[in-house]
Amino acid sequence: MADNDSLDQFLAAAIDAAKKAGQIIRKGFYETKHVEHKGQVDLVTETDKGCEELVFNHLKQLFPNHKFIGEETTAAFGVTELTDEPTWIVDPLDGTTNFVHGFPFVCVSIGLTIGKVPVVGVVYNPIMEELFTGVQGKGAFLNGKRIKVSAQSELLTALLVTEAGTKRDKATLDDTTNRINSLLTKVRSLRMSGSCALDLCGVACGRVDIFYELGFGGPWDIAAGIVIVKEAGGLIFDPSGKDLDITSQRIAASNASLKELFAEALRLTGA
């Protein structure tokens, strides 16, 4: 495991890369977009590709021996295996559909894993000027101010956030809507922001109490947010209530009081 000085160095590099990528996102947000389809509703823009190239080039110059996993390179060349080596896991533009529509929940997400464990996380929304950071053992912050998860202890008064994903086959849609219908009877209300990384940050700073998603894109959606939630005092787990597998495309997050209550509610939906 890296020492504290190394973690601070990694964090500083990730923040620098995120802010540079943020400039590209901010510029592109207000311009006409060139949009390509990765699936029926899954989109990619030149901004996604440009940001990933910028972030990787910046970090590779500083840490040439580290490994790299990114959403767009993975989409083009296939899944890169996560090893124990220091690995930067990057979503250059989480919330691409939001970006295309001019909805300001967009961000760059940069996480670093060592021994397959996320230890540094940076999530930056350049439209709303919010920089979320977390380092293992050092706390989580929003624009430099320490954040923590909510103290909510009852499901019925909890605010839940989730996402509908990009699959539109009938079986998946039926499962998704049936699950949401069931959960809406157990929580105060439900939100969808369109960004997995920002949903995790929402749990970390107490804006929402619970997050879950089944079938998101890959580890780049969650690597940074995992650190930020944990360092804010929250729990990250598989929606079944078991330990998270970062490569499983299943995740849930909450405070300690709500974890078992929510996991049981999800189990009753068949998740």
Curated annotation (Swiss-Prot):
The keyword Transmembrane belongs to this UniProt entry's keyword annotation: no
EC category name: hydrolase
Keyword check for tRNA processing: no
Signal sequence, start to end: none
Ligand binding (Mg(2+) 2): D91, D94, D221
UniProt keywords, alphabetically: Acetylation, Hydrolase, Lithium, Magnesium, Metal-binding
Domain of life of the organism encoding this protein: Eukaryota
EC number: 3.1.3.25, 3.1.3.93
Resulting phenotype, P92L: In vtc4-1; low levels of ascorbate
Pfam families linked: Inositol_P (PF00459)
Function noted in UniProt: Phosphatase acting on L-galactose 1-phosphate (L-Gal 1-P), D-myoinositol 3-phosphate (D-Ins 3-P) and D-myoinositol 1-phosphate (D-Ins 1-P). Can also use beta-glycerophosphate (glycerol 2-P) and, to a lesser extent, D-galactose 1-phosphate (D-Gal 1-P), alpha-D-glucose 1-phosphate (a-D-Glc 1-P), D-mannitol 1-phosphate and adenosine 2'-monophosphate as substrates. No activity with D-fructose 1-phosphate (D-Fru 1-P), fructose 1,6-bisphosphate (Fru 1,6-bisP), D-glucose 6-phosphate (D-Glc 6-P), D-alpha-glycerophosphate (glycerol 3-P), D-sorbitol 6-phosphate and D-myoinositol 2-phosphate.
UniProt similarity note: Belongs to the inositol monophosphatase superfamily.
Name of the protein in question: Inositol-phosphate phosphatase
Lineage: Eukaryota, Viridiplantae, Streptophyta, Embryophyta, Tracheophyta
Gene it is expressed from: VTC4
